[in-house]
Amino acid sequence: ASDVYKRQGKYGIHICHLLQLMLFYGVTTYVVLAVTFDLPFLMEAHHFSSGNSGLMISLFFLAIMAPGFFLGHIVKWMGKHTKFYSLLFIAAGLLLIWISPKEWLIIPGCMLVGLGYGVIQPLIYDETVDTAIPEKTTLALAFVMVMNYLAILLSPFITDFFQTLFHTSSKEFPFIFNLCITLLAMWWEYARKKDSLFGD
């Protein structure tokens, strides 16, 4: 048997690698959900037109979809740093949304977050396929996709918990907090780029 199949163990799935992918996917999904869950409240707090948040969220999802058409070229260009640069896009987008003095500047922020996540999502799915033998790939993908729905389900509760912990009700908090998480993920990816837990 090849080394890949040996690493996949008796269950036909490389459990350690799968868990790492699940964690990474869950964290990145949670981070970008600030755009869909918290953007309308932030815009209202800044006295922007909250009605425009629907358009901005639509552009966010459009940006998620776009990289899929060019993923091969993106990965070829970014190489082993693909996840790092994708996280950088997310961080830049969250920062722009947070500090934006003008309503229209939130649009590129949303799109940067979407583009970063739009690269990470299919990349994670692709790597998940490599963690299992062909007969187990559907099961492995199911476990990874569970993290997407868990992040959606738990995101409001996680944000509320940390807002209570830090005694703040600021509408900017979800973007600041998620930016910090993204920066930590970037540091981890950079520090471990030669032998990253989430290496390409």
Task: For the regions a language model picked out, list residue spans one by one.
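Intracellular juxtamembrane helix-capping segments at the cytosolic ends
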Residues: V119-A132
